[in-house]
Amino acid sequence: MISAERSYDVVILGSGIAGLAGALAAHEFGLQSVILEKAASIGGATVHSYGLIWVGQNHLAQAAGCSESRDEVLAYMRFLGGGNVDDDRLTAFVDWSPEVLRFFERCGVRFRVVRGVTDHYYDEVPGSHAFSRSVEADLISGFELGDWRERVAVPHDVPCFVTAEEQIAWGGVNSAPHWNAALVQQRNRQDMRGKGLGLVCQFLRAVLHRGVTVLTNQNVRRLAADNGRVTGSSSVPASLSERVTALFSRLAVMAQTRR
């Protein structure tokens, strides 16, 4: 059996948005990370989602005319939590999520506010707002990913060539036969990607631009631990079952879950 050992600051299991965002953030803070994806393609469950991100008091909504207070955002979140969410964590989310959005924008990830919808989940409860607090990834061409274009999972259950805002404005998926056919054809030729797929592609582009190591077909078999603390993992590439690569983390192992 051939074996190899490598050391990183952060070892990330899974290439959905959590893994990609974690790798991007790690790099910006001067840490070396590696992403291990079990599947042959990138994206995890994120590519099958609409990729909406709820961020109260975000700068994109404010620039589009949304005026709201921190107290309103907190009231809405507390209503959604129903008393079952630790208030310190809830407050941290409300206070930090707008800055996290700005942080990833500075990293080159492009977002847009979703206009034309009221607040997500409930629109007439304490703290709710008539203007959407949701943002989505801007459309990105798959060709911007170079050789990685074909290595991102493309869903067949979500129309990714339109933004969520456009889909809502055009009457939803049931009205798809009446959408702008010329625009749809143009975007398909350009391989424009939005929603969860677009979100993954935006983050993957930023990660690849920074030289972060991304490995697919990595079947993680074992987590290494030292005094109860996870310190690394052992993976077996699907195409080379006789080769075991042990990846040791100097700081953290980040694992995502998929159903």
Regions found by a protein language model. Give the residues of each.
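Loop/turn elements at helix/coil->beta-strand transitions in domains of secreted/extracellular proteins
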Residues: 8, 29-32, 210-211, 231
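A conserved short coil-to-beta-strand element within the FAD-binding core of flavoproteins
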Residues: 216-229
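Short hydrophobic core segments
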Residues: 10-13, 220-221, 233, 245-250, ...
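Extreme N-terminal leader/targeting segments of oxidoreductases
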Residues: 1-10, 28, 240, 251
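Acidic, glycine-rich active-site loops and adjacent beta-strand->loop/helix elements
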Residues: 16, 39-41, 220
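Accessory "access/gating" subregions that flank catalytic or transport cores
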Residues: 3-5, 222, 234
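N-terminal Rossmann-like FAD-binding beta1-loop-alpha1 element of flavoenzymes
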Residues: 10-35
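Conserved N-terminal/central alpha/beta ligand/cofactor-binding core
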Residues: 38-213, 237-259
